[in-house]
Amino acid sequence: MSISGTLSNYYVDSIISHESDDLTASTRFPSVQYSGSSSAAAANGRQPGGAVHAEHPHPEPYPSCSFQPKPPVFSSSWSPFSPHHGASSLPAVYHPYLPAQHVPSADTRYLRSWLDCAPRGSESVQGHTGQVKLEPQLGHLGGEIPAKLSGQHPHDNPRTCWSRRPRLGFHLLLSPSDDPSANWLHARSSRKKRCPYTKYQTLELEKEFLFNMYLTRDRRHEVARALNLTERQVKIWFQNRRMKMKKQSKDQPKD
């Protein structure tokens, strides 16, 4: 087959298949399977005795090649360590070293939740099977809290422990004076406690007031000594009695 034009002197032997090319291709790439058209397409563009290639590519499309899977480069027994460590004794994947935690025996194991009561002396929980049930949270105090251990002490129920704790409302009902927010209700003034006069003292003071509305210092001392009162109490009583009399005189209608 000849090509006219500028490349008239060159021949394209794309149709002619060379057995030597097929042999070399099969020996170089044993895993790749080529068809007859692919070998013809590979031979396209080669001219006899020159490095000049055809400017026009072959119009036929290249067929898909089927590749066989190659074996892995490293086998499963390969290890990144040196050979003197022994590849057979180490696993394929390296795991970090974790120190083993000491697990106590079943006799010395002591399981305790933060809801439990404090241990009483040297009491120890015995007879349990080692299985602990899930406990509800503190928000569900109304529900039943199951016993965590079969040999738990009957008096160490978490509900009873919770009831032993002092509550704010119950504490206020018992002693409200201890609460700082209720101190203003029971605040004590700096004044002395009011002591009312007896009937005898009131009667004698009324007699003295009718005799004289104002007492001298000496007379006030005598009245206070006779009635077993202080001079200040006698003075205050006379002041209050005068104010009462003045108020009564204002309330009376004028004729």
UniProtKB/Swiss-Prot annotation:
Residues 190-249 bind DNA. Keywords: Developmental protein, DNA-binding, Homeobox, Nucleus, Transcription, Transcription regulation. Pfam families: Homeodomain, Hox9_act. GO terms for biological process: anterior/posterior pattern specification; DNA-templated transcription; embryonic skeletal system morphogenesis; proximal/distal pattern formation. One of its GO terms (molecular function) is RNA polymerase II cis-regulatory region sequence-specific DNA binding. GO terms for cellular component: nucleus. Residues 35-66 are annotated as: Disordered. It comes from the Eukaryota. It is found in: Nucleus. InterPro entries: Abd-B_homeobox_TF, HD, HD_metazoa, Homeobox_CS, Homeodomain-like_sf, Hox9_activation_N, HXA9/HXB9/HXC9. PROSITE patterns: HOMEOBOX_1 (PS00027), HOMEOBOX_2 (PS50071). Belongs to the Abd-B homeobox family. Sequence-specific transcription factor which is part of a developmental regulatory system that provides cells with specific positional identities on the anterior-posterior axis. PANTHER family: AGAP004664-PA (PTHR45970), HOMEOBOX PROTEIN HOX-B9 (PTHR45970:SF5). This is Homeobox protein Hox-B9a. It comes from Takifugu rubripes (Japanese pufferfish).
